[in-house]
Amino acid sequence: MTRPRVLSGVQPTGSLHLGNWLGAIRNWVDLQRSHDTFFCVVDLHAITVPHDPKQLAADTRSTAALYLACGIDPEQATVFVQSQVPAHAELAWLLNCVTPLNWLERMIQFKEKAVKQGDNVSVGLLDYPVLMAADILLYDADQVPVGEDQKQHLELARDIAQQRINSRFGSDDKPVLKVPKPMIMKEGARVMSLTDGSAKMSKSDPNEGARINLLDPPELITKKIKRAKTDPVMGLEFGNSERPEADNLLGLYALLSGQSREQVASECAEMGWGRFKPLLAETTVEACLLYTSPSPRDRTRSRMPSSA
């Protein structure tokens, strides 16, 4: 029986952090056992913004190594670097020739990044979603794990495949390209910054204290959590829009400890930050130490909290 094919990837724009693991890679580890999986280090996407070539090369190697350290098994999944497969860029050019410009101009991420870069914004940044479409369509992916921030880009890939390629060059019974479906991961799909509970944890954030890198030493993890932004309200709770930091840190604890949000809410309802932060730090350190143990496959299968 043919297994459904899945493709996903992460940009090597810095060290992988908890958001990358909880939002993506942890789910990949489960998917590789039930799907035909392709996991890519998307270095061509990383050059759409200012970068240091030598650092990008080092980060590309580091990202690939961390894929394996996190439990991606080369015997179960295909792991590769995007730029090493010329067909990605070749298909992107073909798709460029049929994609309307106004489709790209309405992409939310482009609008946000263009404001930050001003006159330095590149054509590559505008064209980023077409390259992403090529990444997906090249491998006939059935499903693509995406967070909410990438959902619009996947919809563009679907539109390009169906409206601009299949309807013009194929037929109902013989489509040229497979139209992929989104796989939205609910749990851990969007891990927020330690310094701003309303902003996504990001490798590009200039404040190192905003994220926990997978290779941070225990003392640095503890320091970052101790300094994480909180509020003066006693008692911890989920779902209060006026307390985004509480929601984020409690959510991290739930994901890293393997407990449900209901269990964590009950456990921490009467806690103050002074008691909760050491608990979160200890749990986070234990999780991140998984990446330095000698046997990634055994480590992942026996100790990593399940994403189910």
Language-model-derived ranges and their functions:
Residues T2-L7, P12-A134, T283, C288:
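N-terminal Rossmann-like or analogous alpha/beta NTP/dinucleotide-binding catalytic cores
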Residues W28-L31, R164, R299:
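Hydrophobic helix-cap positions at the C-terminus of alpha-helices
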